[in-house]
Protein backbone atom coordinates (compact mmCIF):
# COMPACT_ATOMS: atom_id res chain seq x y z
CA UNK A 1 0.00 0.00 0.00
CA UNK A 2 2.96 2.34 0.52
CA UNK A 3 3.53 2.15 -3.26
CA UNK A 4 0.20 3.81 -4.08
CA UNK A 5 0.24 6.89 -6.30
CA UNK A 6 -1.25 10.28 -5.48
CA UNK A 7 -4.29 9.47 -7.62
CA UNK A 8 -4.80 6.16 -5.83
CA UNK A 9 -4.59 7.79 -2.40
CA UNK A 10 -7.04 10.46 -3.52
CA UNK A 11 -9.42 7.73 -4.69
CA UNK A 12 -9.19 6.01 -1.32
CA UNK A 13 -9.77 9.31 0.47
CA UNK A 14 -12.89 10.00 -1.59
CA UNK A 15 -14.41 6.66 -0.52
CA UNK A 16 -13.27 6.70 3.12
CA UNK A 17 -15.86 6.56 5.90
CA UNK A 18 -15.03 9.30 8.40
CA UNK A 19 -15.89 8.73 12.07
CA UNK A 20 -17.79 11.64 13.60
CA UNK A 21 -19.50 10.53 16.82
CA UNK A 22 -18.28 10.33 20.39
CA UNK A 23 -17.64 6.87 21.85
CA UNK A 24 -19.14 6.36 25.31
CA UNK A 25 -19.71 3.09 27.18
CA UNK A 26 -19.07 0.94 24.13
CA UNK A 27 -21.23 2.83 21.62
CA UNK A 28 -20.86 5.63 19.10
CA UNK A 29 -23.28 8.46 19.83
CA UNK A 30 -23.91 12.12 19.13
CA UNK A 31 -23.09 14.77 21.71
CA UNK A 32 -25.84 15.22 24.30
CA UNK A 33 -26.56 18.73 23.04
CA UNK A 34 -26.39 17.67 19.40
CA UNK A 35 -23.62 20.18 18.67
CA UNK A 36 -20.88 19.56 16.11
CA UNK A 37 -17.72 21.27 14.89
CA UNK A 38 -16.12 21.35 11.46
CA UNK A 39 -13.21 19.02 10.78
CA UNK A 40 -11.13 20.67 8.03
CA UNK A 41 -8.64 19.13 5.60
CA UNK A 42 -5.46 21.25 5.94
CA UNK A 43 -4.35 20.30 2.43
CA UNK A 44 -7.18 22.23 0.76
CA UNK A 45 -9.10 24.05 3.49
CA UNK A 46 -12.26 22.07 2.72
CA UNK A 47 -14.67 20.39 5.13
CA UNK A 48 -13.95 16.72 5.84
CA UNK A 49 -16.87 16.08 8.17
CA UNK A 50 -18.72 17.46 11.17
CA UNK A 51 -17.70 15.90 14.49
CA UNK A 52 -19.63 15.71 17.76
CA UNK A 53 -18.77 18.64 20.03
CA UNK A 54 -18.93 17.13 23.50
CA UNK A 55 -19.29 19.19 26.65
CA UNK A 56 -19.75 18.68 30.40
CA UNK A 57 -22.86 16.54 29.93
CA UNK A 58 -20.97 14.07 27.77
CA UNK A 59 -18.05 14.13 30.19
CA UNK A 60 -20.44 13.18 32.99
CA UNK A 61 -21.71 10.19 31.01
CA UNK A 62 -18.19 9.05 30.13
CA UNK A 63 -16.88 9.42 33.68
CA UNK A 64 -19.80 7.45 35.06
CA UNK A 65 -19.29 4.70 32.49
CA UNK A 66 -15.56 4.61 33.21
CA UNK A 67 -16.11 4.56 36.98
CA UNK A 68 -18.69 1.77 36.76
CA UNK A 69 -16.32 -0.27 34.61
CA UNK A 70 -13.51 0.23 37.09
CA UNK A 71 -15.58 -0.48 40.18
CA UNK A 72 -16.99 -3.77 38.90
CA UNK A 73 -13.50 -4.84 37.75
CA UNK A 74 -14.65 -5.88 34.29
CA UNK A 75 -11.16 -4.93 33.08
CA UNK A 76 -8.81 -4.60 36.04
CA UNK A 77 -10.19 -7.83 37.53
CA UNK A 78 -9.40 -9.93 34.47
CA UNK A 79 -6.37 -12.22 34.73
CA UNK A 80 -3.28 -10.44 33.39
CA UNK A 81 -2.94 -13.06 30.67
CA UNK A 82 -6.43 -12.29 29.39
CA UNK A 83 -5.92 -8.52 29.39
CA UNK A 84 -2.66 -9.07 27.56
CA UNK A 85 -4.36 -11.15 24.87
CA UNK A 86 -7.09 -8.54 24.36
CA UNK A 87 -4.58 -5.71 24.01
CA UNK A 88 -2.50 -7.79 21.61
CA UNK A 89 -5.62 -8.28 19.52
CA UNK A 90 -6.23 -4.52 19.66
CA UNK A 91 -2.71 -3.90 18.33
CA UNK A 92 -3.21 -6.47 15.59
CA UNK A 93 -6.47 -4.82 14.48
CA UNK A 94 -4.62 -1.51 14.28
CA UNK A 95 -2.01 -3.15 12.06
CA UNK A 96 -4.70 -4.68 9.85
CA UNK A 97 -6.28 -1.23 9.49
CA UNK A 98 -2.98 0.56 8.95
CA UNK A 99 -3.95 2.11 5.62
CA UNK A 100 -7.21 3.53 6.96
CA UNK A 101 -5.56 4.94 10.08
CA UNK A 102 -2.70 6.49 8.10
CA UNK A 103 -5.12 8.06 5.63
CA UNK A 104 -7.29 9.49 8.41
CA UNK A 105 -4.17 10.93 10.05
CA UNK A 106 -2.97 12.56 6.85
CA UNK A 107 -6.35 14.01 5.89
CA UNK A 108 -7.03 15.27 9.40
CA UNK A 109 -3.82 17.12 10.25
CA UNK A 110 -1.91 17.48 7.00
CA UNK A 111 1.07 15.19 7.53
CA UNK A 112 2.57 13.39 4.52
CA UNK A 113 0.97 10.01 3.85
CA UNK A 114 4.44 8.47 3.65
CA UNK A 115 5.13 9.50 7.24
CA UNK A 116 1.71 8.35 8.43
CA UNK A 117 2.27 4.95 6.80
CA UNK A 118 5.92 4.66 7.74
CA UNK A 119 5.76 5.91 11.31
CA UNK A 120 2.45 6.99 12.85
CA UNK A 121 0.22 4.00 12.16
CA UNK A 122 2.81 1.26 12.85
CA UNK A 123 4.29 3.08 15.87
CA UNK A 124 0.86 3.42 17.47
CA UNK A 125 0.13 -0.28 17.04
CA UNK A 126 3.59 -1.16 18.34
CA UNK A 127 2.97 0.96 21.44
CA UNK A 128 -0.21 -0.95 22.28
CA UNK A 129 1.52 -4.29 21.66
CA UNK A 130 4.55 -3.31 23.75
CA UNK A 131 2.40 -2.34 26.72
CA UNK A 132 0.38 -5.52 26.31
CA UNK A 133 3.57 -7.53 26.70
CA UNK A 134 4.35 -5.66 29.92
CA UNK A 135 1.08 -6.61 31.64
CA UNK A 136 2.27 -9.92 33.09
CA UNK A 137 5.74 -8.61 33.85
CA UNK A 138 4.81 -6.05 36.52
CA UNK A 139 5.96 -7.58 39.79
CA UNK A 140 5.17 -6.45 43.32
CA UNK A 141 7.72 -6.50 46.14
CA UNK A 142 8.24 -7.97 49.58
CA UNK A 143 10.08 -5.58 51.90
CA UNK A 144 12.93 -6.94 54.07
CA UNK A 145 11.47 -6.79 57.61
CA UNK A 146 11.58 -8.86 60.81
CA UNK A 147 10.38 -12.46 60.73
CA UNK A 148 7.25 -11.60 62.73
CA UNK A 149 5.80 -9.57 59.86
CA UNK A 150 5.16 -9.71 56.15
CA UNK A 151 5.51 -6.36 54.38
CA UNK A 152 4.12 -6.07 50.85
CA UNK A 153 4.62 -3.24 48.38
CA UNK A 154 2.04 -3.50 45.61
CA UNK A 155 0.81 -1.43 42.69
CA UNK A 156 -2.86 -0.91 41.94
CA UNK A 157 -4.64 0.85 39.09
CA UNK A 158 -5.52 4.50 39.74
CA UNK A 159 -9.08 4.29 38.47
CA UNK A 160 -10.39 6.74 35.86
CA UNK A 161 -7.73 8.35 33.65
CA UNK A 162 -8.53 11.35 31.43
CA UNK A 163 -6.02 11.68 28.58
CA UNK A 164 -5.88 14.92 26.58
CA UNK A 165 -3.71 14.60 23.49
CA UNK A 166 -2.43 17.07 20.86
CA UNK A 167 -3.09 17.47 17.17
CA UNK A 168 0.41 16.92 15.79
CA UNK A 169 0.72 13.16 16.41
CA UNK A 170 -2.87 12.37 17.40
CA UNK A 171 -2.71 8.60 16.97
CA UNK A 172 0.73 7.99 18.46
CA UNK A 173 0.17 10.34 21.41
CA UNK A 174 -3.19 8.70 22.14
CA UNK A 175 -1.53 5.30 22.29
CA UNK A 176 1.34 6.58 24.44
CA UNK A 177 -1.31 7.39 27.06
CA UNK A 178 -3.79 4.62 26.34
CA UNK A 179 -1.29 1.76 26.26
CA UNK A 180 0.13 1.99 29.79
CA UNK A 181 -3.15 3.19 31.32
CA UNK A 182 -5.03 0.16 29.99
CA UNK A 183 -2.15 -2.19 30.74
CA UNK A 184 -2.30 -1.28 34.43
CA UNK A 185 -6.06 -1.83 34.62
CA UNK A 186 -7.49 1.68 34.43
CA UNK A 187 -10.53 3.01 32.63
CA UNK A 188 -9.64 5.72 30.10
CA UNK A 189 -11.42 8.76 28.68
CA UNK A 190 -9.52 10.11 25.68
CA UNK A 191 -10.03 13.73 24.61
CA UNK A 192 -8.40 14.26 21.19
CA UNK A 193 -7.70 17.72 19.86
CA UNK A 194 -10.58 19.30 17.98
CA UNK A 195 -8.08 19.87 15.16
CA UNK A 196 -7.43 16.15 14.57
CA UNK A 197 -9.96 13.84 16.28
CA UNK A 198 -10.54 11.19 13.62
CA UNK A 199 -8.02 8.44 14.43
CA UNK A 200 -8.93 8.52 18.13
CA UNK A 201 -12.56 7.94 17.22
CA UNK A 202 -11.66 5.11 14.85
CA UNK A 203 -9.50 3.14 17.27
CA UNK A 204 -12.31 3.18 19.84
CA UNK A 205 -14.25 0.84 17.57
CA UNK A 206 -11.18 -1.34 17.08
CA UNK A 207 -10.72 -1.56 20.86
CA UNK A 208 -14.29 -2.79 21.27
CA UNK A 209 -13.81 -5.29 18.45
CA UNK A 210 -10.69 -6.56 20.21
CA UNK A 211 -12.68 -7.28 23.37
CA UNK A 212 -11.99 -4.30 25.62
CA UNK A 213 -15.15 -4.11 27.77
CA UNK A 214 -17.68 -1.31 27.44
CA UNK A 215 -16.87 1.73 29.56
CA UNK A 216 -13.17 0.96 29.77
CA UNK A 217 -12.23 3.14 26.78
CA UNK A 218 -14.23 6.24 25.89
CA UNK A 219 -13.49 9.05 23.39
CA UNK A 220 -14.87 12.58 23.74
CA UNK A 221 -14.15 14.92 20.81
CA UNK A 222 -14.63 18.60 21.48
CA UNK A 223 -12.93 21.74 22.71
CA UNK A 224 -10.57 22.19 25.61
CA UNK A 225 -12.57 24.93 27.30
CA UNK A 226 -15.69 22.73 27.38
CA UNK A 227 -15.17 18.99 27.59
CA UNK A 228 -11.46 19.23 28.42
CA UNK A 229 -12.15 21.57 31.31
CA UNK A 230 -14.99 19.35 32.53
CA UNK A 231 -12.69 16.34 32.71
CA UNK A 232 -9.89 18.28 34.40
CA UNK A 233 -12.26 19.60 37.07
CA UNK A 234 -14.26 16.40 37.59
CA UNK A 235 -14.16 15.07 41.13
CA UNK A 236 -14.36 11.45 39.97
CA UNK A 237 -11.41 11.54 37.56
CA UNK A 238 -8.30 10.18 39.28
CA UNK A 239 -5.65 11.29 36.79
CA UNK A 240 -5.27 13.85 34.03
CA UNK A 241 -2.48 13.10 31.55
CA UNK A 242 -1.75 15.65 28.86
CA UNK A 243 0.49 16.44 25.91
CA UNK A 244 0.36 19.96 24.51
CA UNK A 245 1.41 23.53 25.20
CA UNK A 246 3.01 24.65 28.45
CA UNK A 247 0.26 27.25 28.89
CA UNK A 248 -2.50 24.63 28.88
CA UNK A 249 -0.40 22.26 30.96
CA UNK A 250 -0.12 24.87 33.71
CA UNK A 251 -3.88 25.43 33.59
CA UNK A 252 -4.59 21.71 33.95
CA UNK A 253 -2.34 21.51 37.00
CA UNK A 254 -4.38 24.36 38.48
CA UNK A 255 -7.57 22.41 37.74
CA UNK A 256 -6.15 19.45 39.64
CA UNK A 257 -5.56 21.65 42.68
CA UNK A 258 -8.99 23.25 42.45
CA UNK A 259 -10.78 19.90 42.21
CA UNK A 260 -9.76 16.62 43.82
CA UNK A 261 -5.97 16.90 43.57
CA UNK A 262 -6.03 14.31 40.79
CA UNK A 263 -2.70 13.10 39.47
CA UNK A 264 -1.55 15.54 36.80
CA UNK A 265 1.12 14.54 34.29
CA UNK A 266 2.02 17.18 31.72
CA UNK A 267 4.19 16.71 28.63
CA UNK A 268 4.58 20.23 27.29
CA UNK A 269 6.53 22.37 24.85
CA UNK A 270 10.14 22.56 23.82
CA UNK A 271 12.79 24.73 22.20
CA UNK A 272 15.41 22.07 21.70
CA UNK A 273 19.08 22.80 20.90
CA UNK A 274 21.02 20.80 18.32
CA UNK A 275 24.74 21.35 18.95
CA UNK A 276 27.22 20.74 16.11
CA UNK A 277 30.85 20.64 17.24
CA UNK A 278 33.77 21.01 14.83
CA UNK A 279 34.78 17.39 15.38
CA UNK A 280 31.38 15.95 14.47
CA UNK A 281 32.07 12.55 12.87
CA UNK A 282 30.18 13.34 9.66
CA UNK A 283 29.22 16.95 8.91
CA UNK A 284 27.01 16.02 5.99
CA UNK A 285 25.09 13.50 8.10
CA UNK A 286 24.74 16.13 10.82
CA UNK A 287 23.44 18.68 8.31
CA UNK A 288 20.97 16.22 6.82
CA UNK A 289 19.76 15.30 10.30
CA UNK A 290 19.46 18.97 11.31
CA UNK A 291 17.16 19.63 8.36
CA UNK A 292 14.96 16.66 9.19
CA UNK A 293 14.94 17.53 12.88
CA UNK A 294 13.12 20.82 12.19
CA UNK A 295 11.19 20.20 8.97
CA UNK A 296 9.78 16.73 9.68
CA UNK A 297 6.02 16.84 10.30
CA UNK A 298 6.05 20.49 9.17
CA UNK A 299 8.03 21.37 12.31
CA UNK A 300 4.92 20.59 14.35
CA UNK A 301 6.91 18.47 16.79
CA UNK A 302 7.43 19.19 20.48
CA UNK A 303 11.00 17.88 20.24
CA UNK A 304 11.80 19.74 17.01
CA UNK A 305 15.43 20.87 16.96
CA UNK A 306 14.41 24.47 16.39
CA UNK A 307 17.68 25.94 17.70
CA UNK A 308 20.77 24.94 15.73
CA UNK A 309 24.04 25.80 17.48
CA UNK A 310 27.08 25.48 15.19
CA UNK A 311 30.73 25.90 16.16
CA UNK A 312 32.00 28.97 14.33
CA UNK A 313 35.13 27.28 12.97
CA UNK A 314 33.01 25.02 10.74
CA UNK A 315 29.91 27.17 10.37
CA UNK A 316 30.41 28.31 6.73
CA UNK A 317 30.81 24.83 5.28
CA UNK A 318 28.15 23.38 7.56
CA UNK A 319 25.59 25.99 6.55
CA UNK A 320 26.28 25.26 2.89
CA UNK A 321 25.50 21.59 3.49
CA UNK A 322 22.45 22.43 5.60
CA UNK A 323 20.93 24.65 2.92
CA UNK A 324 21.46 21.96 0.30
CA UNK A 325 19.58 19.41 2.39
CA UNK A 326 16.90 21.91 3.42
CA UNK A 327 16.05 22.62 -0.21
CA UNK A 328 15.07 18.96 -0.59
CA UNK A 329 12.18 19.54 1.84
CA UNK A 330 9.40 20.87 -0.38
CA UNK A 331 5.88 21.62 0.84
CA UNK A 332 3.34 19.72 -1.25
CA UNK A 333 0.14 17.66 -1.23
CA UNK A 334 0.22 15.33 1.81
CA UNK A 335 -1.32 12.48 -0.21
CA UNK A 336 1.57 12.48 -2.68
CA UNK A 337 3.94 9.71 -1.50
CA UNK A 338 6.91 11.87 -2.56
CA UNK A 339 5.92 14.75 -0.26
CA UNK A 340 8.21 15.45 2.70
CA UNK A 341 6.44 18.51 4.16
CA UNK A 342 2.67 18.60 4.19
CA UNK A 343 0.25 21.29 5.33
CA UNK A 344 0.11 23.09 8.66
CA UNK A 345 -2.76 21.76 10.75
CA UNK A 346 -5.01 24.79 10.22
CA UNK A 347 -5.14 28.44 9.23
CA UNK A 348 -4.57 29.57 12.84
CA UNK A 349 -1.31 27.64 13.16
CA UNK A 350 -0.13 28.81 9.75
CA UNK A 351 -0.74 32.45 10.66
CA UNK A 352 1.10 32.02 13.97
CA UNK A 353 4.17 30.65 12.21
CA UNK A 354 4.08 33.43 9.62
CA UNK A 355 3.93 35.99 12.45
CA UNK A 356 7.07 34.51 13.98
CA UNK A 357 8.82 34.68 10.63
CA UNK A 358 8.03 38.40 10.47
CA UNK A 359 9.24 38.80 14.06
CA UNK A 360 12.53 37.15 13.10
CA UNK A 361 13.00 39.61 10.25
CA UNK A 362 12.15 42.59 12.47
CA UNK A 363 14.56 41.43 15.18
CA UNK A 364 17.43 41.44 12.70
CA UNK A 365 17.95 37.74 12.07
CA UNK A 366 19.26 36.89 8.60
CA UNK A 367 16.71 35.02 6.48
CA UNK A 368 18.58 32.41 4.44
CA UNK A 369 15.74 30.29 3.12
CA UNK A 370 11.97 30.33 2.72
CA UNK A 371 9.84 32.55 4.88
CA UNK A 372 6.65 32.52 2.84
CA UNK A 373 3.30 30.85 2.51
CA UNK A 374 3.24 28.55 -0.51
CA UNK A 375 0.84 26.42 -2.60
CA UNK A 376 -1.90 29.01 -2.07
CA UNK A 377 -3.76 27.85 -5.17
CA UNK A 378 -4.62 24.63 -3.31
CA UNK A 379 -6.54 26.47 -0.60
CA UNK A 380 -4.38 24.67 1.97
CA UNK A 381 -2.11 25.89 4.75
CA UNK A 382 1.47 25.50 3.53
CA UNK A 383 4.68 27.24 4.61
CA UNK A 384 8.11 27.01 3.01
CA UNK A 385 10.95 25.53 5.08
CA UNK A 386 12.55 28.57 6.70
CA UNK A 387 16.06 29.16 8.07
CA UNK A 388 17.30 32.21 9.99
CA UNK A 389 21.00 32.78 10.72
CA UNK A 390 22.72 35.17 13.14
CA UNK A 391 20.05 34.57 15.76
CA UNK A 392 20.92 35.90 19.22
CA UNK A 393 19.63 34.59 22.56
CA UNK A 394 17.58 37.75 23.10
CA UNK A 395 15.45 37.17 20.00
CA UNK A 396 11.98 35.73 20.34
CA UNK A 397 12.63 33.17 17.61
CA UNK A 398 15.46 31.84 19.81
CA UNK A 399 13.34 31.69 22.98
CA UNK A 400 9.73 30.92 22.03
CA UNK A 401 8.24 27.72 20.66
CA UNK A 402 7.07 28.38 17.10
CA UNK A 403 5.80 24.90 16.21
CA UNK A 404 6.48 25.19 12.52
CA UNK A 405 9.26 24.70 9.94
CA UNK A 406 11.41 27.58 11.20
CA UNK A 407 15.05 27.05 12.19
CA UNK A 408 17.09 29.54 14.26
CA UNK A 409 20.88 29.23 13.78
CA UNK A 410 23.41 30.58 16.29
CA UNK A 411 27.20 30.30 16.28
CA UNK A 412 29.47 29.52 19.25
CA UNK A 413 33.17 29.06 19.93
CA UNK A 414 33.50 26.58 22.83
CA UNK A 415 31.61 23.58 24.19
CA UNK A 416 30.97 25.48 27.41
CA UNK A 417 29.39 28.32 25.46
CA UNK A 418 27.24 25.85 23.52
CA UNK A 419 25.97 24.25 26.73
CA UNK A 420 25.15 27.66 28.18
CA UNK A 421 23.22 28.56 25.02
CA UNK A 422 21.53 25.18 24.95
CA UNK A 423 20.31 25.53 28.53
CA UNK A 424 19.23 29.16 28.04
CA UNK A 425 15.56 28.27 27.73
CA UNK A 426 12.47 27.73 29.87
CA UNK A 427 12.13 24.31 28.30
CA UNK A 428 14.01 21.04 28.62
CA UNK A 429 12.47 18.39 26.41
CA UNK A 430 15.34 17.32 24.15
CA UNK A 431 18.84 18.25 23.01
CA UNK A 432 21.58 16.85 20.80
CA UNK A 433 25.33 17.04 20.54
CA UNK A 434 27.43 15.98 17.56
CA UNK A 435 31.05 15.09 18.32
CA UNK A 436 33.58 12.32 17.75
CA UNK A 437 35.07 12.93 21.21
CA UNK A 438 33.57 10.63 23.85
CA UNK A 439 34.61 12.98 26.65
CA UNK A 440 32.79 15.90 25.04
CA UNK A 441 29.75 13.71 24.39
CA UNK A 442 29.54 12.61 28.01
CA UNK A 443 30.26 16.06 29.42
CA UNK A 444 27.74 17.68 27.11
CA UNK A 445 24.97 15.14 27.64
CA UNK A 446 25.35 15.41 31.41
CA UNK A 447 25.32 19.20 31.37
CA UNK A 448 22.34 19.68 29.06
CA UNK A 449 19.12 20.07 31.05
CA UNK A 450 16.80 17.99 28.92
CA UNK A 451 14.76 14.83 29.33
CA UNK A 452 16.38 13.25 26.28
CA UNK A 453 19.84 13.93 24.88
CA UNK A 454 20.85 12.52 21.51
CA UNK A 455 24.51 12.01 20.62
CA UNK A 456 25.37 11.99 16.90
CA UNK A 457 21.71 11.59 15.96
CA UNK A 458 18.35 13.25 16.43
CA UNK A 459 15.21 11.49 17.62
CA UNK A 460 16.68 8.05 18.13
CA UNK A 461 15.06 5.63 20.55
CA UNK A 462 12.18 3.20 20.84
CA UNK A 463 9.50 2.08 23.31
CA UNK A 464 12.13 1.03 25.86
CA UNK A 465 13.21 4.64 26.46
CA UNK A 466 11.17 7.06 28.61
CA UNK A 467 10.05 10.33 27.05
CA UNK A 468 9.44 13.59 28.89
CA UNK A 469 11.00 16.86 29.88
CA UNK A 470 12.76 18.99 32.45
CA UNK A 471 11.69 22.47 33.56
CA UNK A 472 8.59 23.84 31.80
CA UNK A 473 8.55 20.95 29.36
CA UNK A 474 6.55 19.07 31.95
CA UNK A 475 6.67 16.14 34.34
CA UNK A 476 6.13 12.40 34.22
CA UNK A 477 7.25 10.14 31.41
CA UNK A 478 5.61 8.45 28.43
CA UNK A 479 6.96 5.21 26.93
CA UNK A 480 9.04 2.54 28.68
CA UNK A 481 8.20 0.72 31.91
CA UNK A 482 8.41 4.06 33.72
CA UNK A 483 5.17 5.15 32.03
CA UNK A 484 3.32 2.37 33.84
CA UNK A 485 4.18 3.95 37.18
CA UNK A 486 2.11 7.06 36.39
CA UNK A 487 -1.10 5.09 36.22
CA UNK A 488 -0.75 3.12 39.46
CA UNK A 489 -1.03 3.73 43.18
CA UNK A 490 1.70 2.35 45.42
CA UNK A 491 0.28 0.51 48.43
CA UNK A 492 2.12 -0.67 51.54
CA UNK A 493 0.61 -3.61 53.44
CA UNK A 494 2.06 -4.68 56.80
CA UNK A 495 0.89 -8.07 58.02
CA UNK A 496 1.68 -8.92 61.62
CA UNK A 497 2.34 -12.64 61.96
CA UNK A 498 1.80 -14.73 65.07
Predicted regions and their residues:
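Conserved C-terminal structural/oligomerization subdomain of aldehyde/semialdehyde dehydrogenase
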Residues: 46-49, 237, 330, 357, ...
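ALDH superfamily catalytic-core signature
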Residues: 239, 247-392, 455
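Terminal low-complexity tails and localization/encapsulation signals of metabolic enzymes
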Residues: 1-51, 85, 89, 138-164, ...
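Glycine-rich loop-to-alpha-helix module at the N-terminal edge of alpha/beta enzyme cores
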Residues: 48-138
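Short, well-ordered beta-strand elements within core beta-sheets of diverse protein domains
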Residues: 48-54, 71-75, 163, 274-278, ...
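Residue-level signal for inorganic ion chemistry
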Residues: 45, 83, 105, 185, ...
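Rossmann-like NAD(P) dinucleotide-binding subdomain of oxidoreductase/dehydrogenase enzymes
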Residues: 139-285, 412
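A short hydrophobic/small-residue beta-strand
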Residues: 187-189, 367, 452
Amino acid sequence: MSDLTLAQWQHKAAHLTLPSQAFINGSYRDAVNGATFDCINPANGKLLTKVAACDAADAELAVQAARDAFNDKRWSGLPPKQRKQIMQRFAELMRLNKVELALLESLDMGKPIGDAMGYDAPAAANCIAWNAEAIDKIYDQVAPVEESALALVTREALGVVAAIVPWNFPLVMACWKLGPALATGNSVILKPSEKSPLTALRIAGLAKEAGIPDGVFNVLPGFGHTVGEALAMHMDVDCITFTGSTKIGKHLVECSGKSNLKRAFMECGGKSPNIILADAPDLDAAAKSAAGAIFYNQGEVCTAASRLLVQNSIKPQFMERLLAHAREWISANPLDPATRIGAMVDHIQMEQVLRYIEIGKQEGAKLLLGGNRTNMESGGFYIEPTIFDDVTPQMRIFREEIFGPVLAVTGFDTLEEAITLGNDTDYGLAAAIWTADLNKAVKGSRALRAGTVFVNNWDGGDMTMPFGGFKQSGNGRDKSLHALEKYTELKSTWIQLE
